[in-house]
Amino acid sequence: GYGVVVACGGRLGALDGGVFALPRAAALERRLAALHAGVDELVARYQPTALAVEDLYFGRNVQTAMAVGQARGVVLAAAGARSVPCFSYTPQQVKQAVCGTGAADKGQVQRMVAALLSLPAPPEPDHAADALAVAICHLHRLPTGVAIASAAGAPARATGAARKTRSARREVAL
């Protein structure tokens, strides 16, 4: 899923959210190419100051972990090609930022995403709601995240974006 959230003057708003329609029957390389094109199109359209992704953990399902890892690499490469800094958050960090507890369930997260973004109903499908939650998490943690990223040698653009407190910040989460 993907979500685009803007922060302006302490208020949050959803600009876009959904899931990428990837051809299930196509070969892996075609699906990954379609994902790259989708991410590139979102980044070109919304020109986000950052891209945030969720760290996912898979116990014993190696195939799922590999597929998600490949998709994550494509997302990071698409952002890197456009010089958009990337940040990563654990599911617990996302839940804590959105709901106030890292133990929140999926329904709580969806309801809080709707409330924080002033949406009439929780976003659907679930993957879109999750992506919007990751973007909210990033916006809530931005000053800290940028300081950590800058210390680690991240592009100066990330630091500059954090200083633009009066202008709108657009974040894409995948």
Describe every region a protein language model picked out.
Residues 1-174:
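Phosphate- and other anionic-substrate recognition elements at nucleic-acid/protein interfaces
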